[in-house]
Amino acid sequence: TVFIDAVDGSLARLVHVKSVLPKIDGALLDNIVDYLNYVITPCFFLLVKPGMLPADYVVPITAAITITSAYQFCQDDAKTPDHFFKGFPCYWNITVFYMYIFNTSMIVNTVLLSLFCVLIFIPVKYVYPSRLDYLTESRVLKILMHCCSALYGISSFCLLVNYPETNKLWVSLSLGYVGMYLFLSFYRTYYPMFKAKITANNKD
């Protein structure tokens, strides 16, 4: 589903779906499907899979995820005009995937899921993997980023197929992409602020 979500918008724009079907709101349908795949499905997994969360916290945590995610999806600027996600972009399926693969403890899972619920309200600009125009103007870097995204998908799929064994190469590639994604997101959020502040100080 992550792969489909990564390419469906690009394919729709490629074939000009909005022009062919002007009365169909593809963005609305995309949000409905995304909420089901990224929020409801992982919450259901947390509810039915033993050992993911302490028994007393399963319902409160899954409720917090669904409510904060609903808030995120309802924001008219959840996707910014320059094609970034504002706040943690509800990657709950990816989060739960890693918790399952690495068999993290229930306490760690509870803390991380609670933290990510809070991060929804923190206006960090997270990279939109299929919309890179405002991340870089370099065509080479855009192609490289798409290749990295594809490699991430392959490595994560291999981790799932080989579970419970964990291959160091696939782990490194998968987590390396996550690290790069977070770095680019925080860099793109805070570097312009620091740059503007330095420029303003120099003018003074």
Language-model region placement:
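Hydrophobic alpha-helical segments, chiefly the membrane-spanning helices
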Residues: 5-6, 30
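Multi-pass membrane catalytic core of lipid/isoprenoid biosynthesis enzymes
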Residues: 14-72
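Generic hydrophobic alpha-helical membrane-span motif
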Residues: 11-14, 36, 40, 93-100
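Short, motif-level signal for alpha-helix interfacial/capping segments enriched in acidic residues
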Residues: 7-14, 64-69, 159-166
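C-terminal membrane-associated helical module and adjoining short loops/tails
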Residues: 85-204
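Transmembrane alpha-helix/helix-exit interface in multi-pass inner-membrane proteins
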Residues: 76-81
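Cytosolic, membrane-interface loops and tails of multi-pass inner-membrane proteins
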Residues: 7-24, 83-86, 131-132, 202-204
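Structural signature of hydrophobic alpha-helical transmembrane segments
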Residues: 1-3, 53-66, 107-114
